[in-house]
A protein has these predicted regions:
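Thiol-based oxidoreductase modules, predominantly thioredoxin-like and allied folds used
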Residues: 56-74, 89-100
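Short, internal strand/loop/helix patches
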Residues: 76-125
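Generic recognition of short, well-ordered alpha-helical segments
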Residues: 40-43, 72-73, 104-105, 152
Length: 161
């Protein structure tokens, strides 16, 4: 099964898949949190979504509360925070475990992807990024401190469009 077909749920709880959510677009999948030192990356993610969207690209946010409880809100609180604070207009999924015994099936597969240094395994922190091409293959893994405007991330996005 392609990553694009793994069953997911939207932030409002509706069943979906990446294919249903964003069509045949390339996707930057990011585990997000509202109360993290890296939360300002939302601004850059919004900019990526808007800049590359017309070329067949979408950011998809995956709220996660596994890292020091930094995404404690309800779905409504998360949506409100994202839209009013950062103007988030990209899709958000339901709060999801990215590590551990309850790790979502999507992240079970993503965790095997190595980053640029060849390191695979558990998601390290909030705002870890996975670039998924239009065919549902992982085209890159970017660690949390890689900002949305980092040249290596921009180049990777360009390469899948």
């Amino acid at each position: 099964m392609s990553l694009r077909e793994v069953p997911l749920r939207t932030l409002s709880g509706e069943p979906t898949t990446l294919a249903d959510l964003v069509g045949d677009r390339a996707v930057l999948l990011v585990n997000v949190a509202s109360k993290c030192g890296l939360t300002p990356q939302y601004s850059g993610l919004v900019e990526l979504h808007r800049s590359f969207g017309p070329r067949g690209f979408s950011v998809v946010g995956v709220p996660c509360n596994q890292f020091m409880g930094q995404e404690p809100g309800t779905a409504e609180e998360i949506q409100q925070f994202c839209s009013t604070t950062y103007g988030v207009d990209f899709p958000l999924l339901e709060k999801t475990d990215v590590n551990g015994d309850q790790r979502h099936a999507l992240y079970e597969r993503l965790a095997d992807t190595p980053d640029a240094e060849g390191n695979a395994g558990d998601i390290q922190w909030n705002f870890e990024k996975f670039l998924i091409d239009r065919d549902g293959k992982v085209a890159g893994r970017f660690r949390p401190r890689t900002t949305p405007d980092a040249p290596e991330l921009i180049a990777a996005i360009e390469s899948v469009l």
